[in-house]
Amino acid sequence: MILRRLLLAGSLLLASFATAKKDGPKIEVTELEHEPKHLFYFEDSDVVMLQHKYDAYISTDAGVSWAPVKGPDDHMKGKVKAIYHHPYDRTKAYVLGQERTHWTTDDTGKSWREFTIDQALPRSGNPLSFHGKDSNKVILHTIECSGFICQMPALYTTDGFKSHKILTKAQHGCSWAISTPEFAAREEFPENVDNRILCMFTGLHSPIGTQKRLLYSDDFFEGDRGTEVPLNNGRPVSDIVSMVGVKKFLVAAARSPRTNELALYVSDDASRWHQALFDGHRLENNGYTILESTNYSIQVGVKTSGGFNPMSALFTSNSDGVSFTRNAEHLNANNLGYVDFEKIAGIQGIFLVNTVTNWEEIEEHHGGKKKIVSKISFDDGRTFHDIKAGDKNLHLHSVTHIHNTGRVFSSPAPGLVMGVGNVGDSLKEYDDGDLYVSDNAGITWWRALEDAHKYEFGDQGSVLVAVYDEGRTNKISYSLNHGKDWKTAELPVKIRARTLTTTPDSTSLKFLLLGTGKGSSERKHYVIALDFSDVHERKCSKDDFERWPARLNEKEEPDCLMGHKQFYRRRKGKSECFIGEEFKDPVPELERCKCTEEDFECDFNFVRSEDRKDCVPARSLPVPEGQCKKPEDKYTGSSGFRLIPGDDCIKEGGLELDKPKERSCSDTAKEPVSGEIGVSIQHFDANKPAEYYYMERPTLSKDKDETVMLLTDKLEVFMTKDHGKTWQQILAGKNIAKLWPHTYNNDIMYYVTGEKKVFLTKNRGDSFREFETKLPPNRDRLPVLAFHPDPERSEWLIWTGADNCERGGDCHSVAHYSTDGGDEWHTLMRYVGRCEFVGKGGVRKTDELIFCAQHENEDPKNKHFRLLSSENWFTNKKIHYKDILDFRTMAEFIIVAARAGKDSLKVGASIDGDTFADAEFPPNFDVKTQQAYTVLDSSTHSVWLHVTVHNVPDHQFGSIIKSNSNGTSYVLSLSNVNRNNADYVDFEKMQGLEGVALVNVVANVDEVVKGAAKKLRTMITHNDGAEWDYVRPPAMDADGRKYGCSPGKKGTAECGLHLHSYTERRDFRDTFSSPSAVGLMLAVGNVGDHLTLKSEGDTFITRDGGIEWHSVKKGNYIWEYGDQGSIIVIVPESKPTKTIFYTLDEGRTWIEFEFTKVEMQISDITTVPSDTSRNFLLWGTEVGSGAKPGFATVNLDFSGLKERSKKCVLKEEKPEADDYYIWEPKHPLLEDNCLFGHVARYHRKKPDSQCFNGGEFEKLHNVSTNCPCTRQDYECDYNYERQSDGSCALVEGLQPLDPKRICTEDPNAIEYYEPTGYRRIPLTTCEHGVKLDGFKAFPCPNKEKEFEKKHPGLRGVGLFFAIVIPIAAAAAVGYWVYNRWDGKFGRIRLGETSRSGSWLSRDSPLVVVPVAIIAGTVAVMSALPLLAASLWRSFRGWMPVGRGSSRPYSSRGAFAARRGDYVGVVEDEDELLGAEDFDGDEDEEV
């Protein structure tokens, strides 16, 4: 009893049972109280470890006896979270603790060393990343959380955790460049690769951490510096999905925006990267699996069908890992990404796959049952054969139904293969299978045992062990002659087998069987050691072995692969002996062959011909130096073939396909550069286009199409794949009434008819299919189709149709949903107003979240709607509001407008889709029911609303209000903003830059209310709406004449640039700016005191984000950006023309070009939405003499221009060395370039570089270290409003919000701050500097102890010195400064802090600090308690007390804007003087 208790205290019960029969194995059983996990062998030893609940146990005798691992001073007991072995060092292992202490061994578990870290470990996954060459180099991924905000720091060690350092404070996965021994075996590496680390980081300003980038560092990200990996032809790539090491390759996957397509990038030296080509096939999200690969190629399973029955195609790369060839179609796969593919261990070129024979049925009906058959290849996938058991076909369960640890079919035992399956037409269920064996690497098979069994190999195949796997058993089976005959051995206990394993190299005669006994509440677990050492009495001699060929060809002769035949020394099946060479891996004998066609692959710049027999140039070949003076010349170049690296075939007497051959210099010729703009005019027999949409190809795609879909007013559909050079009619006679592009996937377009039939393309018009819905389109002007925002759920649809609308019935709208692209539909909700998928995002964690508006009482005549949501297709539902007008879903917020009584509205917001909070509108804001609001934007961590305050037709205007970061508390940003009858607002945010927006305000509000026409003025913000100013006009017009007014440094009400905006556009897609042309905007307007008629306007451009504007053309033009702003085309909007103007230098010079001999009235000019193409499309009608009827399109192709024929060069490590420079946007009122608390630095093409940008790439180079906070980083808080001097004051008669609310809203809150009238702009990341949003902290109720701990005060002598010494010092310094200062003491305006100037300037700390402290002595007695806490907080703000630096990562792609992680710097002068004491000079007023 005492012994049992002692064992229980160690959480392990030991009981031994032994058998000693000579004709069977020796069996030892250890009983466990808890199920063991993480069992592993130290390679080439009998030492085994496992985890037992919260303890680690070790055995040094192959599992016969076990002892707890105690660690130094027995500290490990009861503290183990997980155990891991080092995959490349047989002596190392790691025990990770539940807290901050962990242990490591480097002597196979004999001794353990303890190390402690400051961070916690992630909840799941292996946090360790290993170096493939130096086993002392390890990366440890950790996590740090503060409230609901978590970051993931990474640590690294170069001495096996004898010491460790912070690698980076925020990452999404880091790995050594040399991550495998195969990669480390490369003979030569670029410099510094040995220490190179690659990490995934949150993208720069990625709103909710969705986009990630890949950076590398050779100095462990010293100084928070890293370089973005140049994946795409030397350029970085956004939105990285994953990065892994595969044998001798590094593989990174990236996602293209607005599509489900992925791109795969491969490197074999961690320096040069190439995009993988998949033989015309496309990769999709969660659509590929890196399979077991070789040292000379990568195998990838690419998903070819989705749904619940996925299938994959097998692709094999060349030796560079770049060019992939399709080997097999319709491989069986599962939803976890596993593919039924496995190589035979130790033998090159042989692998088994499972394929689906009824794949057409599965693709058509996703819920069908697969018919799976097994195939085997003996020649690296070139051909596949049936697996034969006698004369019948054998089918085996593979990776998708794995039932044991380790490999499925084979082990290092040469040629021995086992599997569970059945003979017949297709694979049956696992429990209907039997155990089959092959001893010739899969050529022939036989049934070894009835029923399904787990199995394992020992002594290089001399012993095969199996255990029943369909239920409980008390025996094992084993074979000593390659599985032809079997014996059984009784187990002392009856178990359900869980794992059967042995040493990784299968050279041992000892096995471990893990199983579970009977019962559920008191279930026992067992580790059973099986030892076959005594079954045979003798060790094998020379005559017991054979020279066994690993591969045979169709003539059953030894076959060649990679230039050699492969043989093994293997024990004969009938020999009654054991090899007994423990831990000595079987070594193949290689016999070289003469070279054949199979030993060669296509050389770089070459691809396989269509018949797969030759290698042809993939692109124009490089010109050999000193050759090819004339096109008709000849030169000696590559044959197109090369010997596969690593292939050791004998060339003498064999094929020499890589022998250089004579080529024509015409192969090197590039596409001719005509030097002219190409023009293609196409006419249509229709009056006008009804609608047209670009289906832009994915950014990372290798496709070249530029697809546009067009629906004419005659309801005819046309498609172009070459940007309008040619058009073809599609879906003729199908009665298409509406084009409906997929909101989140550019590859998908729906063609809606007036009935139930819908047509669809999923590949930008390459093919079409049709499906039927349950109902025809609705009649309530509701969106017919709604899409899921997740690219992986692109087939999830909501269709809103009309029901019971015939003959005056109860006509209403019904929503149906489909998860398979429209094949099957299910009712979602009846009597709906509108339904939308919300999906994951931010704190929303489910894909099934749907919101619907539904008529109250399910009565379509009832115009009151309620808002409901569900996470299970409305099997269960939640009612959020009972009387709403409408709702909107956005990236971070869900916004709803609901009635609050008879004559007012209320707005609710949610970030999690579950809990809504009513918005707190600014004071004096009473939104009447008959008035309106417009959701403007939610991309900068806040919601922008326009609330109409005057709603008379043609006289509408309102106020823009902006929310806090959770969308609930709104402050007034700007009043009297223009709106039109259709509820559109003159508001536009600049694309590509943070926080810049333009609006038009009504200048004559009083007159407009009385019925007068509006007079509009344009205003701009550079800090996300916290401050607005009039736009500063240019000094001269396009003809070089001065304007009639000159405002000075900034625009004024009397003299500003006023621009025609959103409410006047024909097409709302025609914006001022472009996301790819950073800093550029074009607009039409005029200089003066208000906006005049558009017909009287001129055309203007800005190149610096709206600070300086230039008049470029007299008159009203429409414009379009091309090649990311390196080409801009303008054309007259209001008059017929034959010409366009274009600029190649951002509007500094303009060139006129005649594109037609017949005048045309142009209605629009377009290009691809990303503005990256060199092609443009004019839409218009011919007028005047020679005009043709109907409308026409004109393609303008600028790719023939010499100035745009060469691709620009960008090197991330030297960004200004070639065709680009670094540009920093700035605020016009600041002397430095800090915006939103940081300096953003962008790549921009040099205007004089004669080249083209090409595909879209990330313009943001990096974000520098965070800046000190200034007034521009704050906006007015709730119930406060901005004054004329830029300060924030409480609205008369109102009170601040109760600051204690945070204590109830956040249970983890320790303190709250006294309201100051200011709050941080949600977008800012500033640190230190001016702190305006919280001077004085108070403890939350019942959190006094925590508050004191966080803010320890000064007492006694310390307090005395803290007061007296600064005053004395300040007096001395103040006297000296006063006599030398350039001015008198005056008022300091709030927040007008300069970051530069002399020591004696007004903002010098030598002046400001003494002023603050001397002034503070006046109130020192009343401020004593406050000062004590203030001194501590100030000290903590300047010195890193109790925490590391909070500076986020500053290099490109790694900047994680940790909003909410701010250092609380208290400015003593602010706290003592109060905000009202700050003022400034007249020339510094805001």
From Swiss-Prot:
Residues exposed to the Cytoplasmic side: 1378-1405
Protein's job: Functions as a sorting receptor in the Golgi compartment required for the intracellular sorting and delivery of soluble vacuolar proteins, like carboxypeptidase Y (CPY) and proteinase A. Executes multiple rounds of sorting by cycling between the late Golgi and a prevacuolar endosome-like compartment.
Record-annotated disulphide pairs: none
Keywords noted in UniProt: Glycoprotein, Golgi apparatus, Membrane, Protein transport, Receptor, Repeat, Signal, Transmembrane, Transmembrane helix, Transport
Protein family (similarity comment): Belongs to the VPS10-related sortilin family.
All ranges on the Lumenal side of the membrane: 21-1356, 1427-1486
Keyword check for ATP-binding: no
Entry's Gene Ontology BP terms: Golgi to endosome transport; Golgi to vacuole transport; protein targeting to vacuole
Membrane-topology descriptor: Multi-pass membrane protein
BNR repeat segments: 57-66, 376-385, 436-445, 478-487, 718-728, 817-826, 1100-1110, 1141-1150
Cleaved signal peptide residues: 1-20
Transmembrane segments: 1357-1377, 1406-1426
Subcellular localization(s) per the UniProt record: Golgi apparatus, trans-Golgi network membrane; Prevacuolar compartment membrane
Pfam families: Sortilin-Vps10 (PF15902), Sortilin_C (PF15901)
This protein's name: Vacuolar protein sorting/targeting protein 10
First-listed, main subcellular location of the protein, grouped into a coarse class: Golgi
Glycosylation: residue positions: N295, N966, N1262
